[in-house]
Amino acid sequence: MRKLRYLYHGSSKRVNILMPQLADDWRFEAGRHFGVYATSNRDLALAFALGGVPDETGTCHRIIREKDRKPFKMTFVRGHPKFGSKGYLYKLSSRGFHHVGGDQWVCENPVKPIKIAEINVDDYIHLFRYATLKERCEIERAFRKQIKRSKENKINKW
């Protein structure tokens, strides 16, 4: 994959330096690295800038599947965006990032943004949708299977 000049990161929090963190994407290995995640897809970063508010069970679960990419939508399985609040779109130099799959890039070091744009969440609600009841059941079933498999793998390693 060709190296891009700029990448994007979206968050509901404003910071001057993006610090590496351990990501936990139960579906893909590319989403389990320690680092600062960025994307070549501006809409994807904006969707993460919408933030997430837990539902009545205390859960906020959002997902982006291949079928939700044209047109782009982040699917809220549980919870909802932070309506009425601010989000932040970070424009980053691609220096130090390596491609980990799809639209995702990771840098293991702290990253100073080139530019930070404050957004109104309500201006970007077209980038999300709620999961249907059927989708929610399918996604949560797959999640439970993955958790069970993960626990079994940890037990089998001992």
Predicted features and spans:
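Conserved NAD+-utilizing ADP-ribose enzyme module
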Residues: M1, R32, G51-W158
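ADP-ribose/NAD+-binding catalytic cleft of ART/PARP-like enzymes
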Residues: M1-R32, L50-G51
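Glycine-rich nucleotide phosphate-binding loop and flanking beta-alpha elements
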Residues: R14-V15, L46, G96-H98
